[in-house]
UniProtKB/Swiss-Prot annotation:
The modification Phosphoserine is found at S3, S102, S124, S138. It comes from Erinaceus europaeus (Western European hedgehog). This is Hemoglobin subunit alpha. The gene is HBA. The modification Phosphothreonine is found at T108, T134, T137. The modification N6-acetyllysine is found at K16. CDD domains: Hb-alpha-like. PROSITE patterns: GLOBIN.
Length: 141
Protein backbone atom coordinates (compact mmCIF):
# COMPACT_ATOMS: atom_id res chain seq x y z
CA UNK A 1 0.00 0.00 0.00
CA UNK A 2 1.32 3.39 -0.95
CA UNK A 3 1.72 5.76 1.98
CA UNK A 4 0.94 9.47 1.76
CA UNK A 5 4.69 10.07 1.44
CA UNK A 6 4.96 7.52 -1.38
CA UNK A 7 2.08 9.17 -3.23
CA UNK A 8 3.67 12.61 -2.85
CA UNK A 9 7.06 11.30 -4.02
CA UNK A 10 5.53 9.61 -7.07
CA UNK A 11 3.45 12.65 -8.06
CA UNK A 12 6.35 15.06 -7.61
CA UNK A 13 8.82 12.91 -9.53
CA UNK A 14 6.36 12.08 -12.31
CA UNK A 15 5.66 15.79 -12.74
CA UNK A 16 9.34 16.34 -13.53
CA UNK A 17 9.20 14.02 -16.54
CA UNK A 18 7.53 16.71 -18.59
CA UNK A 19 6.86 15.56 -22.12
CA UNK A 20 9.49 12.84 -21.93
CA UNK A 21 7.29 10.02 -20.59
CA UNK A 22 6.85 8.39 -23.97
CA UNK A 23 10.55 8.68 -24.74
CA UNK A 24 11.44 7.09 -21.41
CA UNK A 25 8.83 4.37 -21.91
CA UNK A 26 10.34 3.48 -25.27
CA UNK A 27 13.83 3.51 -23.82
CA UNK A 28 12.72 1.22 -20.98
CA UNK A 29 11.18 -1.20 -23.49
CA UNK A 30 14.40 -1.16 -25.55
CA UNK A 31 16.35 -1.89 -22.37
CA UNK A 32 13.99 -4.75 -21.46
CA UNK A 33 14.20 -6.32 -24.93
CA UNK A 34 18.01 -6.19 -24.79
CA UNK A 35 18.35 -7.50 -21.23
CA UNK A 36 15.48 -10.01 -21.41
CA UNK A 37 15.15 -11.21 -25.03
CA UNK A 38 12.32 -13.62 -24.21
CA UNK A 39 10.05 -10.59 -23.70
CA UNK A 40 10.19 -10.01 -27.45
CA UNK A 41 7.82 -12.94 -28.00
CA UNK A 42 4.85 -10.72 -27.13
CA UNK A 43 5.69 -8.36 -29.99
CA UNK A 44 6.19 -10.58 -33.07
CA UNK A 45 4.67 -7.92 -35.33
CA UNK A 46 6.97 -5.10 -34.09
CA UNK A 47 10.26 -3.83 -35.43
CA UNK A 48 12.17 -4.39 -32.20
CA UNK A 49 15.34 -2.58 -33.20
CA UNK A 50 16.34 0.01 -30.60
CA UNK A 51 14.54 3.28 -31.21
CA UNK A 52 12.02 1.87 -33.69
CA UNK A 53 8.80 3.81 -34.17
CA UNK A 54 6.74 0.84 -32.95
CA UNK A 55 8.72 0.49 -29.73
CA UNK A 56 8.51 4.25 -29.16
CA UNK A 57 4.76 4.13 -29.81
CA UNK A 58 4.25 1.33 -27.30
CA UNK A 59 6.51 3.17 -24.86
CA UNK A 60 4.16 6.13 -25.08
CA UNK A 61 1.20 3.83 -24.32
CA UNK A 62 3.05 2.51 -21.27
CA UNK A 63 3.88 6.03 -20.09
CA UNK A 64 0.31 7.22 -20.67
CA UNK A 65 -1.07 4.31 -18.63
CA UNK A 66 1.38 5.06 -15.83
CA UNK A 67 0.38 8.73 -15.94
CA UNK A 68 -3.25 7.64 -15.59
CA UNK A 69 -2.24 5.59 -12.54
CA UNK A 70 -0.28 8.53 -11.07
CA UNK A 71 -3.32 10.75 -11.53
CA UNK A 72 -5.49 8.16 -9.73
CA UNK A 73 -3.25 6.95 -6.91
CA UNK A 74 -6.24 6.48 -4.64
CA UNK A 75 -7.90 4.12 -7.15
CA UNK A 76 -5.26 2.53 -9.37
CA UNK A 77 -7.40 -0.62 -9.86
CA UNK A 78 -10.31 1.45 -11.15
CA UNK A 79 -8.08 3.60 -13.34
CA UNK A 80 -6.41 0.59 -14.98
CA UNK A 81 -9.33 -1.85 -15.03
CA UNK A 82 -9.66 -1.96 -18.82
CA UNK A 83 -5.90 -2.37 -19.23
CA UNK A 84 -5.95 -5.19 -16.69
CA UNK A 85 -8.68 -6.95 -18.69
CA UNK A 86 -6.68 -6.52 -21.91
CA UNK A 87 -3.46 -7.96 -20.49
CA UNK A 88 -5.19 -10.83 -18.68
CA UNK A 89 -7.72 -11.97 -21.25
CA UNK A 90 -6.44 -10.95 -24.66
CA UNK A 91 -2.68 -10.43 -24.51
CA UNK A 92 -1.98 -12.99 -21.78
CA UNK A 93 1.32 -11.43 -20.82
CA UNK A 94 3.34 -13.46 -18.32
CA UNK A 95 3.14 -11.48 -15.05
CA UNK A 96 6.91 -11.64 -14.53
CA UNK A 97 7.32 -9.31 -17.51
CA UNK A 98 5.74 -6.43 -15.60
CA UNK A 99 8.49 -6.74 -13.00
CA UNK A 100 11.14 -6.80 -15.71
CA UNK A 101 9.75 -3.69 -17.38
CA UNK A 102 9.37 -1.96 -14.01
CA UNK A 103 13.05 -2.53 -13.28
CA UNK A 104 14.08 -1.26 -16.71
CA UNK A 105 11.89 1.81 -16.24
CA UNK A 106 13.48 2.55 -12.86
CA UNK A 107 16.94 2.35 -14.45
CA UNK A 108 15.84 4.67 -17.27
CA UNK A 109 14.33 7.21 -14.88
CA UNK A 110 17.43 7.15 -12.67
CA UNK A 111 19.68 7.76 -15.67
CA UNK A 112 17.67 10.76 -16.84
CA UNK A 113 16.94 12.30 -13.42
CA UNK A 114 19.83 11.31 -11.14
CA UNK A 115 19.51 14.28 -8.78
CA UNK A 116 15.79 13.67 -8.23
CA UNK A 117 16.09 9.88 -7.99
CA UNK A 118 16.81 9.77 -4.27
CA UNK A 119 16.62 6.55 -2.26
CA UNK A 120 13.20 7.61 -0.91
CA UNK A 121 11.89 8.40 -4.40
CA UNK A 122 13.34 5.13 -5.71
CA UNK A 123 11.51 3.19 -2.99
CA UNK A 124 8.25 5.04 -3.66
CA UNK A 125 8.46 4.51 -7.43
CA UNK A 126 9.27 0.84 -6.90
CA UNK A 127 6.19 0.44 -4.68
CA UNK A 128 4.09 2.34 -7.22
CA UNK A 129 5.23 0.14 -10.12
CA UNK A 130 4.64 -2.98 -8.01
CA UNK A 131 1.11 -1.71 -7.34
CA UNK A 132 0.54 -1.21 -11.07
CA UNK A 133 1.90 -4.70 -11.82
CA UNK A 134 -0.39 -6.21 -9.18
CA UNK A 135 -3.38 -4.43 -10.70
CA UNK A 136 -2.48 -5.54 -14.22
CA UNK A 137 -2.23 -9.17 -13.10
CA UNK A 138 -5.23 -9.13 -10.73
CA UNK A 139 -7.64 -10.52 -13.33
CA UNK A 140 -5.47 -13.46 -14.39
CA UNK A 141 -7.34 -15.87 -12.11
Amino acid sequence: VLSATDKANVKTFWGKLGGHGGEYGGEALDRMFQAHPTTKTYFPHFDLNPGSAQVKGHGKKVADALTTAVNNLDDVPGALSALSDLHAHKLRVDPVNFKLLSHCLLVTLALHHPADFTPAVHASLDKFLATVATVLTSKYR
